[in-house]
Amino acid sequence: MATTSHMFMYSLTIQPPTAITQAILGQFAGTKEQQIVTASGSKLTIHRPDPTQGKVIPLYTQDVFGIIRTLAAFRLAGSNKDYIIIGSDSGRITIIEYVPSQNRFNRIHLETFGKSGVRRVVPGQYLAVDPKGRACLIASVEKNKLVYVLNRNSQAELTISSPLEAHKPQTLVYSVVALDAGYENPVFAALEVDYSESDQDPTGRAYEEVEKLLVYYELDLGLNHVVRKWTDPVDRTSSMLFQVPGGADGPSGVLVCAEDNITYRHSNQDAFRVPIPRRKGAMENPERKRCITAGVMHKMRGAFFFLLQTEDGDLFKLTLDMVEDDKGQLTGEVKGLKIKYFDTVPLASSLLILKSGFLYVAAEGGNHHFYQFEKLGDDDEETEFNSDDFSADPAAPCTPVYFQPRGAENLNLVEAINSLNPLVDSKVVNISEDDAPQIFTVSGTGARSTFRTLKHGLEVSEIVESELPSVPSAVWTTKLTRADEFDAYIVLSFANGTLVLSIGETVEEVTDTGFLSSAPTLAVQQLGEDSLIQIHPRGIRHILADRRVNEWPAPQHRSIVAAATNERQVAVALSSGEIVYFELDADGSLAEYDERRQMSGTVTCLSLGEVPEGRVRSSFLAVGCDDSTVRILSLDPDTTLENKSVQALTAAPSALNIIAMADSSSGGTTLYLHIGLHSGVYLRTALDEVTGELSDTRTRFLGSKAVKLFQVSVTGQTAVLALSSRPWLGYSDTQTKGFMLTPLDYVGLEWGWNFSSEQCVEGMVGIQGQNLRIFSIEKLDNNMLQQSIPLAYTPRHFIKHPEEPLFYVIEADNNVLSPATRARLLEDSKARGGDTTVLPPEDFGYPRGTGHWASCIQIIDPLDAKAVVGAVELEENEAAVSIAAVPFTSQDDETFLVVGTAKDMTVNPPSSAGGYIHIYRFQEDGKELEFIHKTKVEEPPLALLGFQGRLLAGVGSVLRIYDLGMKQLLRKCQAAVAPKAIVGLQTQGSRIVVSDVRESVTYVVYKYQDNVLIPFVDDSIARWTTAATMVDYETTAGGDKFGNLWLVRCPKKASEEADEEGSGAHLIHDRGYLQGTPNRLELMIHVFTQDIPTSLHKTQLVAGGRDILVWTGFQGTIGILVPFVSREDVDFFQSLEMQLASQCPPLAGRDHLIYRSYYAPVKGVIDGDLCEQYFLLSNDTKMMIAAELDRSVREIERKISDMRTRVAY
């Protein structure tokens, strides 16, 4: 398999994975505030919980280009800062710190101990750190454990020792935790099983008798070696350990969590055991045992408690009772355990309790939750279960205990953090007639599943909307004096006059302002210390603080057509093409410059930059003319109104704005000229502050209307508001400082301006038709907007209605009681006078039952109703597995909804009692479904597709063509085309691309005359296909279960032969090669993404953009593959990728090239995520790489940002 390619793609992530595999808590910034560090895929993110707002704010995200297996925080004694240890797939232990001044992670230590990759004998799966920060243990699933001693040297720098081994061959490890031993030797506890005897015993008796052991490993700091200190057998179902506080805080030891019970164990204490309470209820199975899946221990002054979570999401509060001495003081001896129900939260991968009284729940599926503690559940009515009533012997059966679930009493949800995990399917379509399509996704599990609309844009908070007497053309706000904090007036310009409103408790019209109300206004500015100016077509009014007015009239037969102002300068353009320039003199009056500059064409727009700090004037005036040019004129006293530079444009400019903004290439600020054209194109070009030269122009198409530009302030930074057919905001990215241009999720505006008042410090005022709107933008760190619609069960697939803006989602939940079964159980309980409480499933989940399925089809309207508008429940224990909208030629091309189901399906090992294909007719414009009939098939039909006016179905390994009959589907043709099971179908013409569950894709041709399906080309690699789409007639893009994306192409000769007239007989009798088809597909590109692709689409994401491949991943990732157009770009980005991989290697020590080649060598793909790391480098490193590539830093940054902005966001 050659790794060179003549096709190249640029791989980019537009939405990072949202599944959190682990979260840790610590004071990573070295302050008293706690931060949360989360691992999502290969991304490491630090968040700041804000207790005042009740929000979790992401501060910084870094891609480590490796698999983060485990995280741990530790602090050296006497230090006030926590460090982070990463266990990854690099075969190295990594210690990093967060540097708040640079807002980045820095690597302190990288120690190699083994092979790379996630292997059973390479440490990295488990990580435990001594509570006093003296040592850490890193362990593998089998055999190997390494202990590193952590210390500091004479310069107070963190040091790490050589590893000490604590290996035990043929031993499996289930959990590792560090004991709290105070200042005695560090001790680590592990749950282990020795399988050496059961491995040798063919009878299976040794396996039945195998014991699970709790083992203590002690690190002797004096002798510098690790000893196996204590072992004790525990319950065989034990799977999790929790550290119990020791030293002055508690008795030390561990909690051992097993199926149905929790035991306290320690080498010098008695064991105590409590059962895990089970739910009461008419629909609950009283025999179902629970396990602990997550938990957290929290220490308070003089006390501690545990919150432990079961697989239902129920939280239990567990406390330890201590023996008291004669004086009533607590001794170090444990008296018993107590457990009681606390609250129910979503099933978590990590639980964190913050000192500020919050609980952070990193959910396994769906949104992550941030709760505030209302109380600690000490004095409530909940039944408490005590270990005194239960035997501590693991062999003795534990009497089940029950509790009644209820609504939340102790926790209050303050923020739900959007998460698309697990993202099961997506569609990219434009149903709202915006200029860009929306991404629709189905994600989540159970009753917490959602249908989401994802849209590129910034969230806008509207404050005021009020109707005006007529349609205004422009609006401004102004202060009265330079020292004012807030604006005093809103000035509205109409076709025949001007209206002034004062800003206070209420907004009212005022008349004694000195403004001319009988003429429209062109510009308003607070000038000098305390005066105002109003520019109107007939002249300039200079309104002094005492309301005296100085008037400068426009020359006869000429009027003012454009104006630009700042606090010391005014420039106006006359209808004759002349530029008149004024400057504020020493006594506060406007002085006109002697000469006027005649321009070659009519002036359409002007711009003066702000006066830089410490200067008396802005040095440049930008002039846009209708001859499609922009000129930069000097305003320096020696060269006033002299031409400095000129730039030709593709259309006449409609707006100009000179703004100083943050510059990612220099790290400081740079002067930029923003240009809006009548054609709807926006340009941003750098303006040299000395020479006035224009360079580094970047363009973006914004919409069909002429662009207007306004300088605004958002979250403390200067930004540009660009208005075309919809509003856009240009700002500096909070992390990279690169320039971002993002649409606002708001109505189209005709004019905008800054607005600042006591109620809204940083807002904007805008005009939309006859309405005045005041709004603000609060967050710039998230440019993907999400709208959610709740679903009933876990979604499996969905499709769009062929014409209407409706979607049909098939949903199915395993081991969940169906609505009919639930209703029957409730009726039975009611008849017996039992409990009939029904808990809300979105909080508590559905009642469970082994072997049961709950499944339905839901109709979603995301445009108008923004809700589920119809549903069909499936009965008889059927689960929906596939869906398609199929037009049947035999029914006059009427489109029917076809749903494939499986009956009595078992997921593992896969089995079922056959399947059905249901046919539904669309009614009421698709908002209702009428059941027609269903056809039994021998296996679940996992793939359905409309094909030439008939139905194509993948049933097991057989591909079939069905037509629609009166009573059932009629089989027309079939062929065994896949080795194992067909999971996906694509088609163009008579060609069908069949995805197999574990054997990649096979191309099949349908010969209409012979009525045969003939496979003619397949793949040479067994790919476990999860998603595929045809890119063109010969090429298919796909993703597999191991996180790879690939593109395969049919050889030209094989493709032509398959389509030849009458080639059916030849193809059927063509000799197969290596038990496959006669031909093999060619691999074009291959890359590892570290997420399972669940859908692929060839589409455009932005208005006027190229076709690209958009893919979604199971963990919530949304990525794109952009084809390169020129070989020159490929060479440049390949060189840049190599330089970045060597100059700034990945944080966790993984080799970047090997990481992207996890299962097969990377081929034909350039990693855009790595290229974008260039923005985050220091200036010196940027310049060094730029010198190596023989380019300027600005040029490299432009090329990187263009790759993204031309096709995506």
Swiss-Prot record:
GO biological process: mRNA splicing, via spliceosome
Gene3D superfamilies, per database record: YVTN repeat-like/Quinoprotein amine dehydrogenase
UniProt-listed InterPro entries: Beta-prop_RSE1/DDB1/CPSF1_1st, Cleavage/polyA-sp_fac_asu_C, Quino_amine_DH_bsu, RSE1/DDB1/CFT1/CPSF1, WD40/YVTN_repeat-like_dom_sf, WD40_repeat_dom_sf
Pfam families cross-referenced by the UniProt entry: Beta-prop_RSE1_1st (PF10433), Beta-prop_RSE1_2nd (PF23726), CPSF_A (PF03178)
Keywords: mRNA processing, mRNA splicing, Nucleus, Spliceosome
GO cellular component: nucleus; spliceosomal complex; U2 snRNP
Localisation: Nucleus
Major localization class: nucleus
Gene Ontology molecular function: U2 snRNA binding
Superkingdom of origin organism: Eukaryota
PANTHER family on file: DNA REPAIR/RNA PROCESSING CPSF FAMILY (PTHR10644)
Quaternary structure and partners: Associated with the spliceosome.
Family under the similarity heading: Belongs to the RSE1 family.
Purpose of the protein: Involved in pre-mRNA splicing and cell cycle control.
UniProt name for this protein: Pre-mRNA-splicing factor rse1
Gene name for this UniProt entry: rse1
